[in-house]
Amino acid sequence: MAPHLNIVPSMFVLLLLFISASKVQSDAFDVVAKFGAKADGKTDLSKPFLDAWKEACASVTPSTVVIPKGTYLLSKVNLEGPCKAPIEINVQGTIQAPADPSAFKDPNWVRFYSVENFKMFGGGIFDGQGSIAYEKNTCENREFRSKLPVNIRFDFLTNALIQDITSKDSKLFHINVFACKNITLERLKIEAPDESPNTDGIHMGKSEGVNIIASDIKTGDDCISIGDGTKNMVIKEITCGPGHGISIGSLGKFQNEEPVEGIKISNCTITNTSNGARIKTWPGEHGGAVSEIHFEDITMNNVSSPILIDQQYCPWNKCKKNEESKVKLSNISFKNIRGTSALPEAIKFICSGSSPCQNVELADIDIKHNGAEPATSQCLNVKPITSGKLNPIPCSGPVPKTPSATA
């Protein structure tokens, strides 16, 4: 049985928190009116933004930092807690990063750290201006990539609500959620060109009670990627594509990775992506565990690999090809998944020979190949539990002999 997901209660508590905070007159800290920011697209917003944050964070009553409409240049900012009362950021304008990647010496642009009872909203845009970075970000240029910034980082937040924000053209990931508890991201818009490398829409790790709801993600890598230590998570009502789908992983590349468990992905539409519902682990490398992962009520439109478990994940062919993955996968389900596949192989279950997948369920699957050939299903080291209408027939196709090179 799946572990109890405390998502709905946490969302209710979060809603009550912000309703109760709104009943108290919040102090407004306007970066333009009070701190001298200029919406001219040239003057650095960093100092006015940080000064406004520090005053708001020190307030003993609920406070709101306001970034009015207009275009602002922001070199980088690190906004730290703990704060003395609930704090909000009302972003109405467009905030732009320096276009030149050499302006960054570490992977941070906008970072929120160690904050409780936090809300960000307002319809504003965080524009990473990543086009120059995309041209230089190759698999050989690791040092360059290591300094590319994430658009927005949420690190060590508790009870947070992120609403109605756009992330555009990030140089690396759009949003990174790390070590957070009870954080909801909803009605987000994420956009970058489909050829933009490593621009995951939302990535998270070592977090519990994460909710991603009613968001539109178009990017060059995973729309959502779930790293180690993620527990009790809900993803629903997501529109994904272009991109690489919604992925658990990659996992097993590093030592001491924490288990991933209790993830439900439902009511999503995935269009023109390389992958759809995916779990990916590295061959060889290190151990780990993934359990209670449930993909339900998902529409696939022209997706190259709609349903994929890939325990031979080997992007750029940089892995131990002759070793089995040490990550244990169990209690995984794919239910009511329908649509079309761009390639004949609509379902691929490539599990580890040393640690075969356990309790993998397929129910009510109807995926048709867009081409002349019928859709097929491939299985390696797994015996799926099946029910309902199933198209393609489970495990009806040949198994690939080499690790996959898709990212």
UniProtKB/Swiss-Prot annotation:
The keyword Cell wall biogenesis/degradation applies. It catalyses: (1,4-alpha-D-galacturonosyl)n+m + H2O = (1,4-alpha-D-galacturonosyl)n + (1,4-alpha-D-galacturonosyl)m. GO terms for cellular component: extracellular region. PbH1 repeats lie at residues 180-206, 207-228, 260-281, 290-311, 357-384. Disulfide bonds join 223-240, 351-357, 379-395. Residues 1-26 form the signal peptide. This is Polygalacturonase. The lineage of its organism: Eukaryota, Viridiplantae, Streptophyta, Embryophyta, Tracheophyta.
